[in-house]
Amino acid sequence: MKALFSHYKKLHLWLLANLALLSAFLLARRSRGAMNALTEGFTNPLRRMLGRLCECVPFSVSEGLYVLAAMGFLAFLVLGVRAVVRSRHRSGTVYALVLGLGNAVLTVYVLFCLLWGANYYADSFTDKSGLAVEPVAVDNLERVTRQFAALVNEYAGDIPRAADGAFAGDRAEILAYAPKIYENLYEEFPFLEMTDVPPKTMRFSRVMSAMGFTGFYFPFTGECNVNVDFPAATLPTTVAHELSHRRGIASEQECNFLAVLACLRCGDAAYRYAGALSGYIYLANALYSADAERWRAVRETLDERVVADLRASGAYWAQFEGLADTVSNAVYDGFLKSYGTIGVKSYGACVDLLVAYFK
């Protein structure tokens, strides 16, 4: 064992450093104060700085890194196989290759924990805002769902429509407006204030759709990235959702709530409509689970233009139902649970916040 350690000393020291940092994080995350200090004093400012640097690049640096990582992994496999075949000590070569790959993956994970994972254990939006969330009564759920149905009907006529009645807003204009989305929330929630930049569009948006993703925040570059292939009616809330992550909000449910609220409060028609539509979808899904008859009664009040957008979205996402979508959701569900959230289903928990705020 000693000889093995000595022969691959650098790899083992790298492993020990990774394990030491990971252990320190796992211990420190038990302290809310330590996580607040880490996120507010170091990682959040660092990610914002990285985001400003990457803003100078016209394409998504995040996407470029994913492509490079995939190419690097393939090159590693090819060169690794060749090294094993040519080696006189194949078991040792395999050991070194596996240890090196494991170290690389562990280093990325440790950095992710520090740059982003700490936000799961720091003060949340609910903690900072003081918004009280209580169990949702069905009557209150129905009342707020009706409010959002009325809002989405009201805003449906404010945006351009295609021949089939579906949303036909300009994606470029939606993305360009992004830096202004949160401005009207700063007075009520001053801790959200920061300078925003438009999100980056993904060239592999179709691949994202196949995996069930509409956007993601990449902490290593500080970039917000959005899928631009899916129907654009809810693109504004996707943009707002990712920008809330940029503010250090880790919880998916809180980001969904903030996206709806920011869109409703902003001055752009496409964003207001998307906020009302997304809010209605979250609430209506919850109402359907609680009382299908009440859901049907609310559903019948929807404007045909709203129904056209719901149908367009349903038809688009139906084509991606399959193995890739199932696997990616299972992986992301496991990721969320590893940080103490309740998994992918926590997206629906934003209903509690919507009802608490709008009832």
Go through the PLM ranges and name each one.
Residues 2-15:
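N-terminal membrane topogenic signal
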Residues 19-83:
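Membrane-embedded alpha-helical segments of integral membrane proteins
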Residues 139-143, 250-294:
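Post-HExxH zinc-binding segment in Zn-dependent metallohydrolases
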Residues 160-222, 228, 232:
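Auxiliary, metal-adjacent structural segments of Zn-dependent hydrolase domains
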Residues 305-359:
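Pan-zinc metallopeptidase signature
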